[in-house]
Design a protein with these regions (language model features):
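Flexible mid-to-C-terminal extensions adjoining Fe-S/redox cofactors in radical SAM and related proteins
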Residues: 240-324
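Radical SAM enzyme [4Fe-4S]-AdoMet core and its adjacent flexible, acidic
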Residues: 18, 103-231, 237-247
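Conserved G/P- and acidic residue-centered "switch" motifs that form tight phosphate/ATP-binding loops
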Residues: 42
């Protein structure tokens, strides 16, 4: 699993959770709020704590007269009947990380049979959910096969996100990263055509962003880690992660919250559409300076290849939108 490095055996303390939720769920923040449970490992590792947090969040939202959407990103291996029933009862949005092809999934994540069985249960229970497939050098040339298998095995699923991995360790040089991105675009484009035949929406973050206008790729987040730290990136799920300290801007304790707003603002200014290198880029207002975590993960030369990839897929998406 690509969040494996961020796995932590630490479980958020109940009082810390309540303090964070009390701070976040307030009328002054707007009428519609969203909470997402995700991170290294899986939110379902501690279902009792997950249920406590959800129940308390909905209680607070009702008290504040707010609409609250709750979503969970899970690898699907721990979604038992109790969890499935609860998710259905509460109307919780669900994304399952699933690489579709058995050999790929078992190599990259493991527990294919368990996850596939869980997906079947979700379909039987008429629970809406999305599929997120991580694309690496292992499966980048098998995206058409991925869509064919998805249709064959789970014909009810009509939406899948194919997301290119961000991991420098998988690419020995910039030429290998460019080769990967070129293969991704070629195979993603072909997979979209197959998906269209089956009524499957084949998406991708960069492709979707082509229809958006944004000054910053990712708005800063109020991310609470198991240790009670606050980070600005949803992929920084524990202090075990690389770049944890780069995104750290606060701390939540049982009865207090400390936020360094200057630090937060500095993080927000590290990547946006106003960077000098973005000035003449055609994708400037769609990618919003690019993912800050990607900027930190890749060296300057590697990130140039990442930018080239974003420009190419943005251009393809815009052409597709014109044809539609």
């Amino acid at each position: 699993c690509y969040s494996a490095k961020g796995r932590s055996k630490t479980i958020l303390q109940e009082e810390t959770l309540k303090t964070a939720l009390d701070f976040f769920i307030r009328k002054e923040r707007g009428d519609n709020l969203q909470i997402v449970f995700s991170g290294g490992g899986d939110p379902m590792v501690s279902f009792d704590r997950f249920r406590m947090a959800v129940d308390y969040a909905f209680y607070k939202a009702h008290k504040e007269e707010l609409k609250l959407d709750i979503d969970v990103v899970t690898n699907g291996s721990l979604l038992d009947n109790q969890a499935i029933d609860y998710i259905k009862e509460k109307g919780i949005g669900l994304v399952v990380s699933f690489d579709v092809l058995k050999d790929v999934h078992d190599t990259q994540r493991s527990h294919y049979d368990i996850v596939a069985s869980t997906i079947s249960k979700l379909i039987e229970n008429r629970i809406g959910f999305g599929i997120r497939c991580t694309v690496t050098p292992l499966n980048v040339n098998r995206l058409c096969e991925t869509i064919e298998e998805l249709h064959k095995r789970f014909s009810n699923i009509k939406c899948i996100a194919l997301e290119a991995v961000i991991n420098k360790e998988l690419f020995s040089g910039t030429d290998k990263l460019r080769e990967f991105y070129d293969s991704f675009i070629e195979n993603f484009t072909a997979a979209k055509k197959i998906g269209k035949q089956y009524g499957i929406d084949v998406g991708n973050t960069e492709y979707m962003n082509a229809a958006a206008f944004q000054e910053r790729s990712c708005l800063g987040k109020f991310v609470l880690t198991p240790e009670g730290n606050l980070t600005a990136c949803s992929r920084i799920s524990s202090s075990n992660e690389d770049f944890h300290d780069d995104f750290l801007y606060g701390k939540v304790c049982a009865d207090s919250i400390v936020i360094d707003y200057d630090r937060y603002n500095n993080i927000m200014e590290e990547a946006d559409a106003y960077l000098p290198e973005c000035k003449d880029c055609m994708a400037r207002w769609h990618c919003g300076g690019g993912c800050l975590l990607a900027r930190k993960t890749y060296s300057k030369e590697y990130f140039k290849e990442h930018c080239r990839f974003i420009c190419r897929i943005t251009e393809i998406a815009q052409n597709d939108n014109e044809l539609d």
